[in-house]
Amino acid sequence: MAGKKLKAGILGYGGMGHCHASAYANQKDCELIAVADTVPSQLNSDKAELNLGGFEQAAGSKLRKYNSFEEMVKHEELDFIDICIPTDFHAEFAIKALKLGIPTFSEKPMARTLKQADAMIAAAEASGTPLMIGQCLRFWPAYEYLKDAYDSGKFGKLLRLSMQRISALPRGYKMWFREGARSGGALLDMHIHDTDLVLHMLGMPEAVMTFGCTHHTGAIDDAITNYIYSGGPAVSAETSWSHGPFSMSFIAVFEKATLEAKGMMQELSIYRLDQKIETVKLGEEGGHAREIAYFAKCLKAKKPFARCEPFSTRETIRLALAEERSARTGKKVRL
């Protein structure tokens, strides 16, 4: 297997499916050979709408296409499956794949509920089949730089971290994003990126205090969370499914410098007292291509996914649901 590319199949060919498909273009260890979707208009389209202010296009003319998960796994010898279907189906189809012994890479969030996340882990362990969740900020160069700065202490102690992630209200097939019971609203679908980064970099906070409101979906669609760590740092993250274009950003205040990244984060600014601004070029490759590359590399080498273990992404769900409870009750929630 060392010299061959792993063969991947995508389940779900809407916005994220097309996003993932384009991320296979220059992969060294894997290639996309097939896609499956129950919706003909999505399956046969060469582009799909994302909640990033545009459309994602994938070169899909050479891909074999199937109308269901069952058809694809019956006719293809897949080395792994890449799940890009709506959140409330993640667990069901991940478990089906794992029980068949098919290594599984799934879009975030891991699942709609903690019970579903636990069932996914149990299925992976029972079958001895690898499972990884695509929490892409762990692989996004700007956030990798931030975590390295924190871990190394190169700029001194982290004093404050503020993150923001905002987009227009997404739609999806039959407007599924707008059903809070399915998508979890902005908090579980989009804000969970920043929730995961907080957990990945700083560990589980002692408590969260979230100020938020329901808006379009019945779930929490606008929120700001304070993640409470005794002795610091001061950490907050803001999210909104509002009316404007997509944007993401962070400001990290260290003792010796402040880091800032925004937009699609192809560069990062470093501010130091009484010094010129330093700009770090990070390149155009985002987290989706990099997380798939990591998954395939580990899978080929038969190594665990140390940077993104299933239990760690299960804990991200636990943290996000604590934020939801805080927003709904107006009270601090301890973890």
Where are these regions (language model features)?
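N-terminal Rossmann-like dinucleotide-binding module
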Residues: 1-58
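Beta-loop-alpha module in the N-terminal Rossmann-like domain of NAD(P)-dependent dehydrogenases
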Residues: 20, 57, 61-123
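Contiguous beta-strand/loop segments that form the cofactor/metal-binding neighborhood of enzyme cores
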Residues: 189, 195-267, 292-304, 323
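C-terminal helix-rich "cap/oligomerization" subdomain common to oxidoreductases
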Residues: 1-2, 41, 80-82, 118, ...
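Short glycine/proline- and charge-enriched loop/turn segments
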Residues: 101, 174-182, 273-278
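Predominantly a Rossmann-like dinucleotide-binding segment in NAD(P)-dependent oxidoreductases
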Residues: 16, 130, 137-211, 216, ...
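Hydrophobic residues in well-ordered beta-strands that form the structural core
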Residues: 106, 131-133, 237, 261
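Active-site loop of classical SDR/Rossmann-like NAD(P)-dependent oxidoreductases
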Residues: 19, 281-293, 308
